[in-house]
């Protein structure tokens, strides 16, 4: 059974990232996503590990020089800029946070990449692009915020050209729900702009239903789950600053539930690639 909540409104997700996004960035860095560690002995820094996960996405996307890539849920654009530099592509990023779009645009100008990467406010379930506008697309930890993943995949298929590649990194439900897990997952869904946690089987079904083929799904939970404990530790160092932004009760709850989310067996993570038929 999948953990489901009432459909997340755009305002819920926007408020999460607008509310403490800058505090998050001050302790975690510019990558608003998990890190990837090769094994238990890997002592890479958060910066190295988060860039490594970006590089995994870049490799799977396999975008070619000069192609146009859509970043679905772009955050402040750090992975997009890395993609531009690595693959010599043009990127269009979309987000439902005006603040994130502005920050991404500012940071991209500072990096001298404004002619290669642009960012705008848009709804991933109703994209403002013509059919066949992009050669490739990725969704980097944005899908669990979507009220209807199938609709996002339908839109991705629509704006991708035939043969276009899709890469997704997403938090999923890995195991059947236990009573303890339900408490944690319900709290995460209700308080942090998360609509639901899907499963691998649900992804396979939704991808096939929307015309994607050559689907490859890799469970990388063991490589990324360390993120949550480290993130809780990082938030702990700025607890007072976080409390100033979201309130003491919410700050305490955030730190507690991030740590607990990383310790329950239901908490999983997948990296997948597919091709638009």
Predicted feature residues:
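A short glycine-rich, Lys/Arg-flanked "PGG" loop and its adjoining helix->strand segment in the class I
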Residues: 150-165
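Short, glycine-/aromatic-enriched active-site segment of Class I SAM-dependent methyltransferases
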Residues: 172-194
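Conserved alpha-helix/loop element of class I SAM-dependent methyltransferases that forms part
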Residues: 30-38, 44-65
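N-terminal auxiliary segments of SAM/dcSAM-dependent transferases
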Residues: 1-26
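C-terminal helical/coil "lid" or tail adjacent to the Rossmann-like core of SAM-dependent
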Residues: 221-265
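A short acidic, Gly/Pro-enriched loop at the edge of an enzyme's catalytic core
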Residues: 125-136
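Class I SAM-dependent methyltransferase SAM/SAH-binding core
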Residues: 68-72, 76-126
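Short alpha-helix
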Residues: 195-211
């Amino acid at each position: 059974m999948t953990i489901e909540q009432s459909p997340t409104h755009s305002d819920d997700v926007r408020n999460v990232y607008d509310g403490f996004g800058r505090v998050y960035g001050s302790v975690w860095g510019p990558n608003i996503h998990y890190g990837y560690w090769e094994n238990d002995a890997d002592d890479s820094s958060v910066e190295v590990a988060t860039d490594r996960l970006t590089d995994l996405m870049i490799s799977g996307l396999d975008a070619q020089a000069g192609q146009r890539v859509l970043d679905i849920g772009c955050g402040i654009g750090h992975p997009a800029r890395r993609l531009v530099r690595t693959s010599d592509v043009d990127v269009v990023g979309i987000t439902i946070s005006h603040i994130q779009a502005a920050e991404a645009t500012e940071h991209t100008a500072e990096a001298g990449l404004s002619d290669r990467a642009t960012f705008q406010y848009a709804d991933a379930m109703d994209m403002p692009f013509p059919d066949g506008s992009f050669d490739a697309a990725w969704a980097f930890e944005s899908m669990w915020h979507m009220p209807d993943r199938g609709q996002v995949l339908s839109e991705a298929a629509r704006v991708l050209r035939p043969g276009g590649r899709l890469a997704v990194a997403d938090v999923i439900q890995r195991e059947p729900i236990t009573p303890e897990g339900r408490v944690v997952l319900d709290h995460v869904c209700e308080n942090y702009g998360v609509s639901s946690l899907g499963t691998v089987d649900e992804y396979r079904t939704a991808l096939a239903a929307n015309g994607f083929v050559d689907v490859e799904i890799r469970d990388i939970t063991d490589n990324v789950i360390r993120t949550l404990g480290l993130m809780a530790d990082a938030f702990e160092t700025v607890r007072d600053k976080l409390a100033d932004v979201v309130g003491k009760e919410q700050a305490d709850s955030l730190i507690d539930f991030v740590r607990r989310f990383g310790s329950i067996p239901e908490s999983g993570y997948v990296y997948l690639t597919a091709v638009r038929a």
